[in-house]
Amino acid sequence: MKTRTKNLISLVLLSSCLTAMVGCNTQGKGKVDKDNLVFDKNGIVLDNFEGLGVEWGTYEDPDKLSSGSWERSLKIMDRLNPQVTRCMLNYDWFITNFDDKFDSDKSNDTWEYNFSNKLMNNTIDVLRYCDDHNIDVAFGCWNVPGSLGKDEYNMFTEVTSDARWATMTADILEYLIKFQGIKCIKYFVNSNEPNYSGVEGKSKNYNNTFEVWAKGVKNVRKALDDRGFNDIKIIGGDTTGFEGTIEYFNGISKNDELKEAVGDYGFHVYCPNMIIDTGDLAVRIRDIYNQVKKNDKDLGVKRIPHIWEAGLYDGKNAETDSNAYIANYSYGLRMADYTLQCAIAGVNSIVYWDFDDGMHFMYNADGTMTSKGWGMFSSLSTDSAMKQRLRPWYHSSVLLTNLMRKGSKIIDNPANDPEVDNTFRSMAVVDENNTYAGVVAINRGMLPVTKTFRVAEEFLSNATTPNKIYVYIYNEADLNIGEDGFVKENQVLDLSLKDEIEISVPQNSMVILSSKEL
């Protein structure tokens, strides 16, 4: 007969009830126990997670920012504490004095660069922050230079396979790395979403194919190596959508030369709610992973899977490239669920789209600009005070980015199988030195559920606070925001994660139990 010591805990000012229970119950063998969850070495999916981050690119018009917004943005970034980011720009911003010699021979074209402008200054500000805060950067260009309807550089036919693209890439990276001393650039993005071709006159990418993109990757690889940038990896794809991603990943995995030219399998996922809500996202990611693994045994070793743009598809307005649900609590819960499912499926890092509404714009036919509303807040002076507030999904992201650090172990459990339960998911996160651990529990159901959690004692062998559990609850009623405007714990328990902890997880909520303050 099992014996337990029960501790009832009152959560002041919370609408939900949480209890803690210490005991010796263990997960049974055979049939999956979906109520008593143990995280041990058998559940390790990743043993060297690379961290979470957010898209933080060059601000396309810094003059539109509100007074003091840059300083505020840095404080917001400080609290988010990402370990990876993606920084994109346009080469058009810097190319000047282009001369094609009035002939069809591209090899004798000449051009210069003007790096003394506000766009390069802002780019360097972002990259220096990343240097100072040990943030790995995927740096790249949205697409080949040239404006729609003009193609003044004659690059739309060959796209990134044009040899001049590789030269421009190496030139700009050389300026940043050798002349500006930037050290954080670890990856190069060989154009954004190359599989999204579009149509001539409305897209620079209309003539792109996998073969064209692959040729461009090889050109860029040689150009970077010739400049001594052998350690900068090229993202293997940066594709969007499941179907297009599978095409590119299979193409890479079956081509030995191309496999050696790229440094990861990188893609974008804007996921429909239904796929996340039912737990099917993890299933789909694993399916892609297993397909690639058949051809590339180094998947997960030499070439790591990354998601470089993570967002939700439902609520997207194609005309404004914004999401109508971005300020809802449900957006934050789904993005947390998205993150958990990708992590337990083996994705090694995830970059959220995106940080600030003030970064990117839609350029309209009448010459006006419309900001893309996907951010965690807005720094635009023209936006209302409401839009400039931190959105709920910023706070849920803060909790995850501060728990899921570089080098962490991600630990799954059998109860996450959607056939067992498609409304509840959980994982454990343990840092590389076993100094802290955390459990993330997400209830997508319509009713509260009671679960018990235990993290194997071996994962807390060097715990700095072995008998403390910081409890964080994310939902509209219980999210706890401190006087500084940032999320804080709901309660601190004098317990250990190596003991059995029983909690009631409210409906449509995330609960995090962490042995360190997040």
At which residue positions do the language-model features occur?
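Glycoside hydrolase catalytic-domain groove-lining segments
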Residues: 270-318
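Aromatic/acidic polysaccharide-binding cleft in carbohydrate-active enzymes
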Residues: 307, 311-426
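Bacterial N-terminal signal peptides that target proteins for export
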Residues: 2-12
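N-terminal carbohydrate-binding accessory modules
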Residues: 28-78
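C-terminal motif of bacterial Sec signal peptides marking the signal peptidase cleavage site
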Residues: 20-23
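C-terminal beta-strand-rich structural cap/linker in extracellular carbohydrate-active enzymes
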Residues: 487-518
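Substrate-binding cleft and catalytic face of glycoside hydrolase catalytic domains
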Residues: 80-275
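Carbohydrate-binding surface patches
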Residues: 419-463, 508-514
